[in-house]
């Protein structure tokens, strides 16, 4: 096998916020890669298998996903196509090329009806079409591959790219003096795309044992906590951020009330957990500010 820095990465979902942060990291490290956007490569189409194989990668990162949670309720077949059939095809590629597969999954595979952090082996019980489609994708991988697969469950992703909660809140903080209402009864782990990209890189480099891992920034917070932290970092009045309940924001989707993911699997394989969420936010905040300034 090629030396790590010479290993060629293949990245699906290459235009998404996570992939773009991962590409930034690979560029910094001088690691070769090919990244396909969903327009360039449809992971649910069997032709994607031959396209990736022709590229002869040493490692496959599946970031392609249907992530619109609300739309998944309306179009479950479309979500399943990307989130289940896609991973099935990616597992086939990895199997035929005999290369590692790193697949990104979600906290939505759990019910969210707990008060204790969810472990990697906790009972999966998705409460939404999106969560079910992602769980089925996980099962496609574990069914197809005996080794060299890494399923990284993450949550509440944000960063300088694409659309996400943190950028939306920052825009409201700096363009208006009006109060905003933010949910404070959903508890999870805000996770930067930079932190997750770095963890993916470490997994690829260290080649820890195959399996499921929880890849989120540590600690826990509500959406209100995250919004308050953003207001504070940008020097705006935190009192403008008003706590609200989920019931005040009607939705087709039943979102997890408590989706904190247990990180203990990392220490068992000799790896550190990802940084605490506030520290991770502060590290990436200047980049988010620059991105928002460009978009305004």
Regions found by a protein language model. Give the residues of each.
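N-terminal Rossmann NAD(P)H-binding glycine-rich loop of SDR-like oxidoreductase domains
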Residues: 2, 7-25
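Catalytic helix-loop patch of NAD(P)-dependent Rossmann-fold dehydrogenases
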Residues: 81-89, 96, 109-152, 156-157
